[in-house]
Regions:
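Conserved Class I S-adenosyl-L-methionine-dependent methyltransferase catalytic core
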Residues: 2-113
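Conserved class I S-adenosyl-L-methionine
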Residues: 115-126
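Conserved acidic residues
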Residues: 118, 197, 214-215
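Conserved SAM-binding loop of SAM-dependent methyltransferases across substrates and taxa
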Residues: 127-138
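Conserved SAM-binding motif I beta-strand of class I
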Residues: 142-148
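S-adenosyl-L-methionine
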Residues: 158-210
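A conserved beta-strand element that flanks and buttresses the S-adenosyl-L-methionine
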Residues: 218
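A short, conserved alpha-helix within the catalytic core of class I
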Residues: 225-236
Length: 237
């Protein structure tokens, strides 16, 4: 975290105390992160009065996608989310929104399906719920996540729990692979990443992507939570 430029952390996300890693590295808390403070601010299900809101969200989403699409793409197990039993099935409010976002992207992702490998980059992906759907349905996608270190730790846990055999590249393994102890002159090339399923890195390293090879960039809502300097940084890259 000490490497992350302070000017790229907005007030909205400057919420983690110095001792937060004690909670983050607590095995019981990480197993239940979708029902505790570890997912604060990137999990709408933690809000109060969620039963009625979940019913309404399910009803609206069903009209858009159909119930079969929801059942195929929901994920209500990892992280012990706060679910509600509706119409003989369990649903998580935040999960329904992720399904909506995924449904909105399917047509764009399908355009890349014929490529053996294509690169999808999500900025501010939270615990990895959306990128999981993308990888599940489009196995040829190499999925990049750029976010704060705390979220990266949680998304790494979440995605590995869903797919223990997934090949994940993080900052430590990237530096080892590039045989460097310094980030200053590092360049991230297409060939560095093509053998991985997930690449999970701190947001500021997006500027190290060399000879832009990303096929699809995604940001669902976190740009509105960033300061203008941070938004400009991402758009300039």
């Amino acid at each position: 975290k000490s490497l992350f430029p302070r000017n790229l952390i907005s007030k909205h996300w400057d919420i983690y105390p110095d001792n937060f890693k004690k909670s983050l590295f607590n095995s019981d808390k990480i197993k239940n992160f979708r029902s505790n403070d570890l997912s604060f601010k990137f999990n709408d299900s933690l809000e109060k009065g969620m039963l009625l809101r979940t019913k309404r969200a399910l009803e609206k989403l069903t009209k858009i996608t159909g119930r079969e699409f929801i059942e195929k793409n929901k994920e209500t197990m990892i992280g012990n989310p706060k679910t509600f039993y509706i119409d003989n099935e369990y649903y998580d409010y935040h999960d329904l929104f992720i399904i909506y976002f995924y449904h909105s992207l399917v047509s764009f992702l399908s355009e890349k399906r014929d490529k053996e490998i294509f690169f999808v980059c999500e900025i501010g992906g939270g615990y990895g719920g959306l990128i999981h759907r993308i990888k599940k349905n489009f196995p040829g996608a190499v999925c990049l996540l750029f976010d704060l270190p705390e979220q990266n730790y949680i998304s790494n846990y979440y995605l590995k729990q869903l797919n223990p055999k997934a090949k994940v590249l993080n900052l430590e393994s990237l530096m080892s692979m590039k045989k460097t102890k310094s980030l200053d002159s590092m360049k991230i090339e297409r060939d560095d990443l093509k053998k991985f399923d997930y690449v999970i890195l701190p947001g500021y390293l997006i500027e190290k992507i060399h000879n832009s090879f990303i096929d699809i960039f995604i940001n669902t809502r976190s740009f509105m939570e960033m300061n203008l300097e941070t938004v400009y940084f991402y758009f300039s890259e």
